[in-house]
Amino acid sequence: MSGNTGERPFADIITSIRYWVIHSITIPSLFIAGWLFVSTGLAYDVFGSPRPNEYFTESRQEIPLITGRFNSLEQVDEFTRSL
C-alpha cells in the first residue's frame, strides 16, 4: 500500500484557476524578458561573446586560428591586439 505524502494531485493543480492566473503572467513575462535580453545586446555584454559585426574587423578578415601548440599564448595576444 502506498502512503500519502500530503501533496496536492497534479490534476488539481493544473485545473485550478489560481495556477493559470499565476502562469499566464509569469510565462509570457519570462519570454519577453529573454527576448529583451538578447535583442538589446545585453547578452553579448554579459557573456563576453562578440557581436555579429565584431567577428571580423577591417584589418583582420581571416579566421583567428591557433596553429602552434607551444606558442599559443603569443598567438592569442596577437589576435587580441589586432582588435
UniProtKB/Swiss-Prot annotation:
Pfam families: Cytochrom_B559, Cytochrom_B559a. Its main location: plastid. One of its GO terms (molecular function) is heme binding. The chain crosses the membrane at residues 21-35. Keywords: Chloroplast, Electron transport, Heme, Iron, Membrane, Metal-binding, Photosynthesis, Photosystem II, Plastid, Thylakoid, Transmembrane, Transmembrane helix, Transport. With its partner (PsbF) binds heme. PSII binds additional chlorophylls, carotenoids and specific lipids. GO terms for cellular component: chloroplast thylakoid membrane; photosystem II reaction center. NCBIfam families: cyt_b559_alpha. This is Cytochrome b559 subunit alpha. It comes from Huperzia lucidula.
